[in-house]
Amino acid sequence: MNPVEPLAAPQRQHLRYLLEQGLPLASRPYRVLAERIGAGEDEVLEQVRRWDEDGLFRRFGVILHHRALGYTANAMLVLDVADAEVDAVGRALAHETIVSLCYRRPRRLPMWPYNLFCMIHGRERGEVERQIEALLERHALRQTPHRWLFSLRAYKQCGGRYTAPPADLERRHG
């Protein structure tokens, strides 16, 4: 084992591969991962902490499959917010419990004037429309150019994949 790292190189590769597949749904997911790579839970937690400190993770988050949970009315609210205000408006909207995702993107003029995007999920279209109307009212955005776009189709969601599976992993777990 490398004295600098809590896990040996093959264990690190296996752990990275498993993390990219998603955390197991368990009360102690890192213990489950530790068992799968033949290590201790503390070693796995320490390795993840070091990777985080080293900047290995750009984002570590949850991907919810909303449709499987009954949230079939999913809308992207797009707004054309003044550049001087977009960061503050984005932060305010991101704190709303109904907003699952909020981010800024460059406008693509002349066809696409919107620079702020918010995802809102609901069980029925009318429910989502009412939530959007209330959101616009609460944040005084009714006069800000905006549209809401409902999803017509669900695409596969998954996190980034950067690690090839370890060669012996396919034989053991494939």
Curated annotation (Swiss-Prot):
<dbReference type="Pfam" id="PF22451">
    <property type="entry name" value="NirdL-like_HTH"/>
</dbReference>
<dbReference type="GO" id="GO:0016829">
    <property type="term" value="F:lyase activity"/>
</dbReference>
<keyword id="KW-0456">Lyase</keyword>
<dbReference type="InterPro" id="IPR053953">
    <property type="entry name" value="NirdL-like_HTH"/>
</dbReference>
<dbReference type="InterPro" id="IPR040523">
    <property type="entry name" value="AsnC_trans_reg2"/>
</dbReference>
<comment type="function">
    <text>Involved in heme d1 biosynthesis. Catalyzes the decarboxylation of siroheme into didecarboxysiroheme.</text>
</comment>
<comment type="subunit">
    <text>Probably forms a complex composed of NirD, NirL, NirG and NirH. All proteins are required for the total conversion of siroheme to didecarboxysiroheme.</text>
</comment>
<protein>
    <recommendedName>
        <fullName>Siroheme decarboxylase NirL subunit</fullName>
        <ecNumber>4.1.1.111</ecNumber>
    </recommendedName>
</protein>
<dbReference type="Pfam" id="PF17805">
    <property type="entry name" value="AsnC_trans_reg2"/>
</dbReference>
<comment type="similarity">
    <text>Belongs to the Ahb/Nir family.</text>
</comment>
<dbReference type="InterPro" id="IPR050684">
    <property type="entry name" value="HTH-Siroheme_Decarb"/>
</dbReference>
<comment type="pathway">
    <text>Porphyrin-containing compound metabolism.</text>
</comment>
<dbReference type="GO" id="GO:0006783">
    <property type="term" value="P:heme biosynthetic process"/>
</dbReference>
